[in-house]
Amino acid sequence: AVTPKLIQQLNGKFIQILTGARRTGKTVLLQRCVDHLLRQEHTPAKSIFYFNFDDLELRRELKSDPNLLLEAIALFSGKPLAAHSTPVYLFLDEVQKLPAYFDQLKLYYDTFRPKLRLMLSGSAALEIGSQAAETFAGRIQQTRLFPFSAKEVFHQHFTELQLPSVLSQLLEGRFDAEALRQLQADLLPLQSQLHAKLRQILVSGLLPQAYLAQNDTERMDYLRQYRITYLERDIRGLAQVGNWEDFSRLLNLLILQIGSFLNKTGLSQELGIAQNTVRKYISILEQTFLLEQIEPYTGHVRKNLVKSPKIFFFDSGFFGLVSGLTNYEVLVNSGKIGPIFENFCLNEIRKAMSLSAQFPEIHFWRTTGGAEVDFVIKTDSHLIPVEVKLSDSYGQSDLKNLLKFKATYPKKVDKMILIYNGPLQYSGNIVFLPIWFI
């Protein structure tokens, strides 16, 4: 579904930029867009051009001849870009390798739009984000890519299942409780298999190659190499990172604290580095999509509410790499499985929200008295409080904070969500939601 949406956006008025963490499929998606244009849209091959800036020779040639791309279009299509009567599609991968070329791309866009349709992608979000935002101001539309979603994995293994996004239905006002009850009845024979698959992905994470690894050793080797590549290629060369080893130690410490309140003073003291440096390094982790700070929701009631943000990581698999806890039973016995499940649910909510036209925000809610709701999804008109519980059952104590939140913001809250491992249910405006229905 992402590819047709991207093509629709590409045919709009903005330059499309694919962002996201390393190895989340940006190159693959570019190639799928090319294939979609050829097979589904029947776009002539001579109107589609793909260049990968990872090619050192290409970068050298572009530096010496900035108009090389226009010359290539003219050569292979048989006429210059200005003479085309139908759109020409230009896909450029790993564009962060040549940020000086952004000014040239801006010139192409301003000169040849709407004939030229331009899509860029790359791994180093810092260079792409800051440089593109400045160069292409008012001209770009960004799409963030994520690792696999749990729904994709469940669809892959249980191809006969229909697993709609209940969260999307709630956000778009088309929630149908009766239809979902029937779906749940169809799922009952597969509950144990679904639970087994969930246990696997909580440990492995959902980066494609980590999830598809044949065994724990292969998975850990991949994640270890991913971490090294991120630090060596994306971070080591950045002027903002004064001490590479301090950055690496902070990254490890933050991974072990997923789901916790961010305490920059404590991190500074534990690592022996200045608070300003901690703040700067955390900003880099956010801009490269590895780390996310979730801010508390305060609304109009600001007294007696916690103000510190909570930290989450983009994929749960790295917790095992850093902690050494590499299987589900060990994680359960360590007491760390709760924060990992919470982190996992946040990522799945993010993936579902990225497909929504509502552009919702996500927060958490906690009072100084200890009442807490794990997540609060905020749209223009509604709030949806979300509690997370790694269990196949629930009690009234699991609902009390949802109800307290609703009582605090009665005009904003209609539906509430409890994510857990039991069957899909709907009662008293609370949706009891298995992870595979997010």
Predicted regions and their residues:
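Accessory nucleic acid-recognition modules appended to NTPase machines
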Residues: 49, 211-383
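Short glycine-rich substrate-engagement loop in P-loop NTPases that contacts/grips substrate
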Residues: 51-85
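Interdomain motor-coupling "hinge/lid" segment immediately C-terminal to the ATP-binding subdomain
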Residues: 131-247, 251, 255
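Pre-Walker A adenine-sensing motif
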Residues: 1-13
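Hydrophobic anchor at the beta1->P-loop junction of P-loop NTPases
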Residues: 18
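Domain-level recognition of nuclease-like catalytic cores that cleave nucleotide substrates
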Residues: 421-438
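Walker A/P-loop
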Residues: 27
